[in-house]
């Protein structure tokens, strides 16, 4: 869970994500049309926050960073798991206590009764991706300010809550799958793909604004276009098929790092491998396998349960030897036996995945998995989690040790008095490892440099910049 911050002067986040607004600073602005905004949850929710803020800034509202400076606070909530629900409710309560005027939106907004039971004094509640409804509620409770309509109050790319050099590109909304542990479809609906021309227009604007890395996100990236039967769209006057491969081809021609998230292991992924092997798309796949036991995958109702996953991974690595695979897994799912768990550990040994996250199963209100028999005890969940992480740390450490002495490109994220911190193609922001370059204080965020790896641990690399290498600022 991250909580992002909006700086109205530079439309970027702080380097360490924090809450948008703080409670202890006195108001220094005139009153009337000032919005405080707190964005909780995943990158897809962050994109929704960017869209709402862009519309409000276009209409002349100011966005401020403290509770005291705000005339009204919007909280964009997360409701994916129970801990996220509690964080959302706590944040709403904090905003009410410090400001008093709060509009709630986002995934938890579909549970209006639950919110009002805890916080009856919120001004309004909307569900996820209800952009116009949120703005209309702001109009109702905070009159639209007078402003010069000919003055451009936002950049061409809109308000962005990420650093200037990378941006999330959401290509669709919703999901057609019905995994038993997940309630996303009940909150965000079935798959709805954005028009491909609209996506490519946005990507081009981001490129023109200096963005170096596009992080392609959705609930199911590999299903992009399925809902519209991959119909033909248009971009720059030319026909373009609405599909993941065609989208990746066009994005890869723009000269940015293109990183794919939330991909399912369908056969269609094979078609993207040549783009990764040729350097048009980063050789990085974020694929949530979730488990390796066929029986548990069936209980989860995972769409790829019947796929020959290991065969696909081997084929992908043959087509693109540099491929980095990130995945997430659940341990302690209802009915998981020691035999099932051992299948998962064996899969880690066989698959040799580069980046892995693991979660202990917990019930989520409204999820069908709650009703499955044979729950796993908390003690067993913890024990399996520790065994899983120990296994994966050994794999990750060995893989990173083999990179010592190699030359890599590094996208710089942060520079301080000790040096620079960046990421390689193998590292997505916030969730993967980092590359440390000690002493390189003259670099800037957004620079792309060449470096030689000198040291590694289980997750991160230490490198030195290659002399006389070109910077891409």
From Swiss-Prot:
The keyword Glycoprotein does not apply. [4Fe-4S] cluster 1 binds at residues 42, 78, 107. Residues 33-143 form the MTTase N-terminal domain. Residues 401-467 form the TRAM domain. Pfam families: Radical_SAM, TRAM_2, UPF0004. GO terms for cellular component: cytosol. Its EC number is 2.8.4.4. It catalyses: L-aspartate(89)-[ribosomal protein uS12]-hydrogen + (sulfur carrier)-SH + AH2 + 2 S-adenosyl-L-methionine = 3-methylsulfanyl-L-aspartate(89)-[ribosomal protein uS12]-hydrogen + (sulfur carrier)-H + 5'-deoxyadenosine + L-methionine + A + S-adenosyl-L-homocysteine + 2 H(+). Disulfide bonds: none annotated. Keywords: 4Fe-4S, Cytoplasm, Iron, Iron-sulfur, Metal-binding, S-adenosyl-L-methionine, Transferase. One of its GO terms (biological process) is tRNA modification. Residues 161-399 form the Radical SAM core domain. Its cofactor is [4Fe-4S] cluster. It is an enzyme of class 2 (transferase). InterPro entries: Elp3/MiaA/NifB-like_rSAM, Methylthiotransferase, Methylthiotransferase_CS, Methylthiotransferase_N, Methylthiotransferase_N_sf, NA-bd_OB-fold, Ribosomal_uS12_MeSTrfase_RimO, rSAM. Gene3D superfamilies: Methylthiotransferase, N-terminal domain, Nucleic acid-binding proteins, tm_1862 like domain. Its main location: cytoplasm. NCBIfam families: 30S ribosomal protein S12 methylthiotransferase RimO, MiaB/RimO family radical SAM methylthiotransferase. PANTHER family: RIBOSOMAL PROTEIN S12 METHYLTHIOTRANSFERASE RIMO (PTHR43837), RIBOSOMAL PROTEIN US12 METHYLTHIOTRANSFERASE RIMO (PTHR43837:SF1). Belongs to the methylthiotransferase family. RimO subfamily. Catalyzes the methylthiolation of an aspartic acid residue of ribosomal protein uS12. This is Ribosomal protein uS12 methylthiotransferase RimO. It comes from Pseudoalteromonas atlantica (strain T6c / ATCC BAA-1087).
